[in-house]
Amino acid sequence: MDGTLLNSQGEVSLTNAELIRNSGLPVTLVSARAPMEMREAIETLGLKGLQIGFNGALIYQMRDGNVKPIRVQPLVQNEVQELLTYIRKQFPTVSMSYYDLNNWYCDRIDEGIRYEHNLTHQQPTFITDEDKFLEATINIFKIMLISFSESEMQKLESTLRSLDMNNITIQRSGKAYLEITHVNAKKSIGIDYIFEKEKLKKEETAAFGDGHNDLPMFGRVAYPIVMENASDDIKAVA
């Protein structure tokens, strides 16, 4: 959605909203965002069908303003605490937060949290005792890391990949974002589910995107459409 459907204010423009609503085509939003961050666009576009959040960790529908999960793939709970502790120790300046189905959590307000708030207009839930909070049964779908230093981001990504944790996948989503989801949470898996559910043929489908986390999705559709703002390696697949 960011860098693709949404404008610089994080909104669907009136022109695009009207064109999409009047197209008569079924539209699914496929995003790294949480459902709460997708809600405004879904309502603006009048979408009623399946939507995909958290890079494929959640397939859902909006029903009467509520999220109705269809397929969920949260992170392994004990690994969430392990990752949070490790990242805080090794990369204390990186902005870190995480999501369950309906909430965005953090333990401090920093530049990354303020940036995300301005982009999505969401308010984080502040956690003062994280160990106790995570002792309860809770489905965490995504850990989000933000750094505006490219060198720090590259070091963070390479370090996390070197941990060789088989249950997670690590993806860049924009220049400043690194996101951790379950290994089975991929946009392409969400697309496959919708293909089967709606009995779609590949030649009937197109996808728009601009990031590395869109590449698996592009491989599933007949018409991958890459935005002008994408990097050259992403444009190469179009």
Task: Label the predicted regions.
Residues 55, 191, 217-221:
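Hydrophobic residues within well-ordered alpha-helices
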Residues 11-113:
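Active-site phosphate-binding/coordination module
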Residues 1-10, 218:
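Asp-based phosphoryl-transfer active-site loop
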Residues 94-208, 212, 229:
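Conserved acidic, metal-coordinating active-site core of Asp-based
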Residues 201, 224-238:
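Asp-based, Mg2+/Mn2+-dependent phosphohydrolase catalytic module
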Residues 15, 37-40, 155, 190, ...:
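Phosphate- and divalent-cation-binding pockets in alpha/beta enzyme and binding domains
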Residues 24-28, 47-49, 142, 203-204, ...:
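Short active-site oxyanion
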Residues 6, 74, 181-185:
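Conserved beta-strand/loop elements of the cytosolic catalytic core of P-type E1-E2 ATPases, chiefly
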